[in-house]
Amino acid sequence: MNKRIMYKFTRNFLNILNILIRFLILYLCYSGADVWNEEIPFNGNLSNGSPNLCQSGRHQSPINIMTKNLVYDHSLSTMEIEGLEKQLELVVENCGYDIRISLTGEFIQLNGGPSSYPYRIDFMQIKFGSASTQGSEHTIDGKAFPGELQIYAFNTELYNNFSDASYRPNGILAVSVFFKLGNATNKDLLGVVAAAEQTIFKGETFQLKGLELRSLLTSTHEFMTYEGSLPFPPCQETVTWIILNHPITITETELKTLRRLRVAHTLWSGSMADNFRPTQTINNRSVRTNINFRSSNEACDVRKQFSYIANIAHV
């Protein structure tokens, strides 16, 4: 009888111990916002920059944008994109801390906006949350969106590649597009999510063909802009950010697909969700916009009320 009791006790103890070990592995492998300050690799090399800039820099990204403090700048020109209609070839990769979408064929060039230089798109990244009330890196009046598409481009007039430009003045232009929760599917965003679903584990890649940027960048005329940094190590402060005023729609089903992505090579390694960096101190930087909210035109007031609604009441 005693042996039977001892056997049951031992078996139960081992089951509990196994659960605790699995929980510990999950905790240690999880790489969401709470452990963002660990050295996330940037091209596998931090030797040309200072990792400490992520903590000591005074022009870091992302930031919280207060709409009442926006500065209207009539000199900001419209951003133009050459190649919106092109059928792109992309490589979608699970980097562990992010989904990276790299252009492999056609060149897409950005002109205008806050810069007089031409910039070539190099790659895109997607930020998203474990719940639909969070996910974006930039926030508006303290409110987050369910996700954020970030498009990174480098200055082709001054530099040869993204890596070189990321350490140089006027090196990088980053375009941010917020996700807004809805029922309508954006066909090209759906294509990206479907490709990401083929890269569940870190290091997996998938080739995606036929994507057009014009459905991801539906409106580029209205934007906000500020000087900031790469939101990942080495956090170089060489980035001009453009935050588009109009979000694109993502469905809850698509978000659930993204949340299934893993940060390592096993199912229990934790979800990639909450891969956003916390907002950084603005340190007296100004955020300019080409939207004149002081205009008496009624459409401007409607735009402000609609476009800047984040997750106040489950968008």
Question: Where are these predicted regions, by residue range?
Answer:
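Alpha-carbonic anhydrase
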Residues: 2-13, 17-315
